From Swiss-Prot:
HAMAP family: LpxB. The keyword Metal-binding does not apply. GO terms for molecular function: lipid-A-disaccharide synthase activity; phospholipid binding. Belongs to the LpxB family. GO terms for biological process: lipid A biosynthetic process. It comes from Pseudomonas putida (strain ATCC 47054 / DSM 6125 / CFBP 8728 / NCIMB 11950 / KT2440). Pathway: Bacterial outer membrane biogenesis; LPS lipid A biosynthesis. This is Lipid-A-disaccharide synthase. InterPro entries: Glyco_trans_19 (IPR003835). GO terms for cellular component: membrane. It catalyses: a lipid X + a UDP-2-N,3-O-bis[(3R)-3-hydroxyacyl]-alpha-D-glucosamine = a lipid A disaccharide + UDP + H(+).
């Protein structure tokens, strides 16, 4: 059999992690496989020949995208031309749908097999994107089971491979060891996780600290940990802490240690809610957006829930306090009983963890190779 050539494109750090795991699993089955495309340091370490730095694709927010649109479109056009000339056996677009779905469509029209790894949130909003996916994608690989059901209903070939986080996070976290590592003793501990982006922390940081002050009056001896995504976020939080007397430890990164150590979490909606679920920590989910953005999204979003635990459970498993409902008083009052006993939430968390724990990288590799069995 001729040497297998796999093209991959990842647009951000989370895609680099997924891509490197998939590449490792493919190499275990085809040691001489050749990898081309765009990826980060982890994918390059697995042998990817990256055409340009992945950072050029990692753009957040509408305004930033508009500022770089000409460059992004030029890079995409050149990438499509290069890949059509190279004729890989398969192209795998990892997340970054606004960049990769168009590549998949053009390559499939040129006779190259295409796979999309990580579903965009088409089940929640901009559902018409599924038409583009159906046209441009030979196979969709989803991390979550409800996504796979959506694609089956839409007639898109799909495989639910499980979530890599569910593979790496243990079914039972060692709370005493995590507390010892962070210098925390006995007594109730609450993790505050207001997000990793500047805008999120700007909208939620002070609110979460206000809620923590209220919670201190309701739960005797409670302490708080707040993992900061980077030095900029830490400086932002430190400014908000001026003049407050909170028993709070700021951490640099270490969000997984914070989740392992705590009894409950006050958390921004996002991927971190899945991490909290996998650590079996009861949570209250909060989110605030700019008023106009919230008004628009409220009309676009088709899903009754915003947090991953509720989407996975298909019911309100964890409280969601959004926009004007997210007051410091409401957050503290909702969180206080969960610090004492959150077992009603966490029993279901264990069941969900086991559903998602499927050895995702190997499942994804098997699905890709099954697509190529007749090459």
């Amino acid at each position: 059999m001729a040497q297998l050539c796999v093209a991959l494109v990842a647009g951000e750090a989370s895609g680099d992690i997924l891509g490197s795991g998939l590449m490792r699993a493919l190499k275990a089955r085809h040691p001489d496989v050749r990898f081309i495309g765009v990826g980060g340091p982890l994918m390059e370490a697995e042998g990817l020949q990256s055409y340009f730095p992945m950072e050029r694709l990692a753009v957040m927010g509408l305004v930033e995208v508009l500022g770089r649109l000409r460059e992004l479109l030029k890079r995409r056009k050149l990438l499509i031309q290069t890949l059509i000339e190279e004729k890989p056996d398969v192209f795998i677009g990892i997340d970054a749908p606004d960049f990769t779905l168009n590549i998949e469509l053009k390559l499939r029209q040129a006779g190259i097999k295409t796979v999309h790894y990580v579903s965009p949130s088409v089940w929640a909003w901009r559902q018409k994107r599924v038409l583009k996916i159906r046209e441009g994608c030979d196979l969709m690989l989803t991390l979550l089971p409800f996504e796979a059901r959506f694609y089956e209903e839409q007639g898109v070939p799909v495989r639910f491979v499980g979530h890599p986080l569910a593979d790496t996070i243990p079914l039972e976290a060692d709370r005493p060891a995590a507390r010892a590592a962070l210098g925390l003793g006995e007594g109730p501990v609450v993790a505050l996780m207001p997000g990793s982006r500047g805008g999120e922390v700007g909208r939620l940081g002070a609110l979460f600290l206000d809620a923590a002050e209220r919670l201190s009056q309701q739960v005797p001896g409670v302490r708080f940990v707040l993992p900061c995504a980077n030095a900029t976020r830490r400086a932002q939080i430190e400014q908000m802490l001026e003049g407050r007397q909170l028993p709070l430890t700021l951490l640099d990164g270490q969000s997984h240690q914070a989740l392992a150590a705590c009894d409950a979490v006050l958390i921004a909606s996002g991927t971190a809610t899945l991490e909290a679920l996998l650590y079996k920590r009861p949570m209250v989910v909060a989110y605030r957006l700019a008023p106009l953005t919230f008004w628009i999204l409220k009309r676009l979003v088709k899903s009754p829930y915003v947090s991953l635990p509720n989407l996975l459970a298909q019911r309100e498993l964890v409280p969601e306090l959004l926009q004007d409902d997210a007051t410091s008083e409401a957050l503290a009052n909702t969180l206080a009983p969960l610090v004492r006993d959150g077992s009603q939430q966490t029993e279901r968390f264990d069941e969900i963890h086991r559903t998602l724990r499927r050895d995702a990288s190997n499942q994804a590799a098997e699905a890709v190779l099954a697509l190529l069995k007749d090459r």
